[in-house]
A protein has these predicted regions:
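Charged, compositionally biased N-terminal leader segments and the immediate start
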Residues: 1-26
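Charged catalytic cores and adjacent phosphate/nucleic-acid-binding surfaces used
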Residues: 2-3, 194-339, 343-349, 360-373, ...
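Accessory alpha-helical DNA-binding modules that contact the DNA backbone or grooves
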Residues: 4, 28-234, 241, 255-256, ...
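A short small-residue
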Residues: 14-20, 151-153, 380-386
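Alpha-helix C-capping/helix-to-loop hinge sites
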Residues: 17-24, 44, 153-156, 451
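Two-metal-ion RNase H-like nuclease active-site motif
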Residues: 185-187, 341-345, 422
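Core AdoMet radical
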Residues: 378-379, 421-422
């Protein structure tokens, strides 16, 4: 197999083909298919090259047989003849511009074609020189918007989304734990604190034989290059592009090491200040009292020596957790086991949705929800496309789907099924489904899926439209952020929180890998304002249901307890949020 590309590069290639179809006026569903395939490839926790070698490309949602065949050609030869034919005649520079937030294919094509743009730097120079504003369909404002978007692109880092780093780290940890010399192995840093994006993966091991552990570690099959190797430390680069740093410490002092390298920096600075006032010092080796080092096997003992309760890693950001630990007022954080159901699940039911269709049938999803031990679940496909259907057509499609779901409710008495839809909050402050259609449902999840660049006042008004609707129970992915590609839009959060409480509307913590939205900081603010939250997987395939754990991590970072999350309630209490 030629050494081709990471998932990110393959996703970029697939998006370029979608762009070509958009410019050439190709089949709308071809465009959607390639966009969806790109999204699923980019957010896959397994490298596509590895899946291809194992004959498992078909396990990635959205990879139809034709795309699989093209990828097979890519991995075998390093090129795809069909893709090269499609791109013939297209200005090469346009494909680089597609990475700019808000830059659609037709705009990228027009700029690259007319101004002979070669890359993003070239576009920036032309924009600063005022060359864009005089083009047909552009103006001074659009020129400034392009410059702002270029700056946004440059501000991005090489950090990866939490689920990708987490599952990569789990493979390394599983390998390390098979070593007879390893007593414990744990992640460190931002990964252990479950931050939404991660840089390098840091791991700590406890062992009396550190050299043997290092020698074992560097034989991990996913390593592409050994960066550094010492007697206690080693850094390697994996085939998926992630760097993993391993540090091996003494078992009897592992608690202090784990605490120190978990961070955060601000949390540790605060601990150090407290220690100094007690005339002691803290380090990754332990706590020094009157010149004598005291070692700690566990973090619990480390914090206890400082007069504090154990602080969960997700809370260690110096946002009040140290004070709470000192006064024994830390929250009892929500756990994955507390979740009783998942209501944001997309299927492959042919409702002709406004956005991407799910991969699996109602029946497959119901079976997996039962396997997970859920009391209830929501089938919540995107509503029919508002721009491609009349109101009557939308209602007819909802009626047919409702009939199907009612049949499923009758045949699956051991799990409660909610007939929901995820509807669009349109740019004109209307919902994408008429009231007569919404009345057929058990409830609705509403979110913004277009016009993300409207100003704070306008976006807030759109969200309030949904919150004030008697048919909407949940606001999905409230900030609209896409980690690494789109910033959250500005909203007037105090007003939104107030209206959510008043209207008994739930704000979602969306666990989709590149959303993790509501962010943890807003989770904490929402809870403080009395808002109830719900954690959802937003799954588009049966295997995505497991993403819910990342939503739980976001909730924990936001200090959420079981009582703050609606879907920890048993069915008889939970159903009161909906029209059942």
């Amino acid at each position: 197999m030629p050494k081709f590309t990471t998932n990110k590069e393959i996703a970029k290639l697939l998006r370029s083909i979608s762009a070509v179809y958009a410019i050439k006026g190709g089949n709308y569903f071809q465009m959607i298919a390639y966009d969806r395939a790109a999204d699923n490839v980019e957010h896959s926790t397994s490298e596509l090259g590895d899946l291809w070698q194992d004959g498992k490309l078909g396990t990635v949602p959205g990879l139809g047989k034709s795309i699989q065949a093209y990828l097979d050609e890519l991995f075998k030869t390093g090129r795809v003849g069909h893709f090269e034919s499609l791109k013939k005649g297209m200005p090469a520079g346009m494909f680089e511009l597609l990475s700019i937030p808000g830059m659609g294919p037709k705009t990228a094509y027009k700029l690259a074609k007319i101004l002979k743009i070669k890359d993003i730097g070239d576009l920036e120079l032309k924009a600063k020189a005022g060359k864009i504003r005089d083009l047909p369909g552009f103006g001074a404002k659009s020129e400034q918007d392009i410059l702002a978007s270029i700056n946004e692109t440059r501000s991005r880092t090489d950090r990866v989304i939490l689920p990708f780093a987490y599952e990569t780290a789990q493979r390394v940890l599983d390998y390390l734990k098979k070593c007879k010399d390893v007593e414990r192995a744990e992640p460190l840093g931002s990964l252990r604190r479950m931050v939404a994006t991660i840089g390098d993966i840091d791991i700590a091991g406890a062992s009396k034989s550190p050299q043997e552990v290092i020698d074992y570690f560097i034989k991990f099959k996913e390593i592409s290059r050994i960066i550094d190797k010492g007697s206690r430390k080693s850094s390697v680069l994996l085939t998926n592009g992630m760097q993993v740093d391993l540090l091996v410490g003494k078992p009897q002092a592992f608690g202090a090491l784990l605490q120190h390298f978990t961070g955060s920096k601000n949390h540790n600075i605060h601990l150090r200040e407290i220690a100094q006032k007690k005339d002691i010092s803290v380090s990754d080796y332990g706590i020094t009292v009157k010149g004598k080092l005291k070692e700690f096997k566990t973090e619990g003992n480390f914090y206890g020596f400082l007069g504090m309760d154990y602080i969960e890693p997700e809370l260690r950001e110096d946002t009040g957790e140290i004070e709470a630990a000192t006064t024994h007022k830390l929250p009892d954080l929500i756990k994955l086991a507390d979740i009783k159901g998942d209501i944001h699940i997309h299927s492959n039911y042919p409702i002709e949705p406004s956005h991407d269709l799910g991969k699996d049938s109602f029946e497959v999803l119901i079976k997996e929800a039962k396997h997970l031990g859920y009391e209830y679940m929501g089938l919540s496909d995107h509503s029919p496309g508002n721009s491609t259907h009349s109101e009557k057509q939308i209602v007819d499609l909802i009626q047919k789907r409702t009939y199907k779901i009612e049949q499923l409710k009758s045949s699956h008495k051991d799990i409660r099924i909610l007939n929901l839809l995820e509807i669009d909050i349109l740019a004109n402050n209307k919902l994408s489904v008429p009231d007569v259609g919404l009345e057929l449902l058990d409830g609705a999840i509403a979110g913004i899926h277009s016009s993300h660049r409207q100003d704070k006042k306008t976006q807030t008004k759109r969200i309030l439209t949904a919150i004030n609707s008697p048919y909407v129970q949940v606001i999905s992915h409230p900030t609209g952020r896409l980690l690494g590609s789109r910033e959250a839009y500005e909203l007037d959060w105090p007003i939104i929180f107030k209206e959510c409480v008043k209207n008994k509307t739930l704000l979602e913590i969306n666990a989709w890998p590149n959303r993790l939205d509501l962010p943890d900081t807003l989770v904490k603010e929402a809870i403080g304002s009395g808002v109830n939250l719900i954690i959802s997987s937003d799954s588009h395939a049966v295997e995505h249901l497991g993403n819910l754990q990342y939503g739980v991590s976001v909730a924990r970072r936001g200090w959420a307890q079981k009582k703050d999350i609606a879907n920890t309630l048993p069915w008889l209490e939970f159903k009161k949020w909906f029209n059942v």
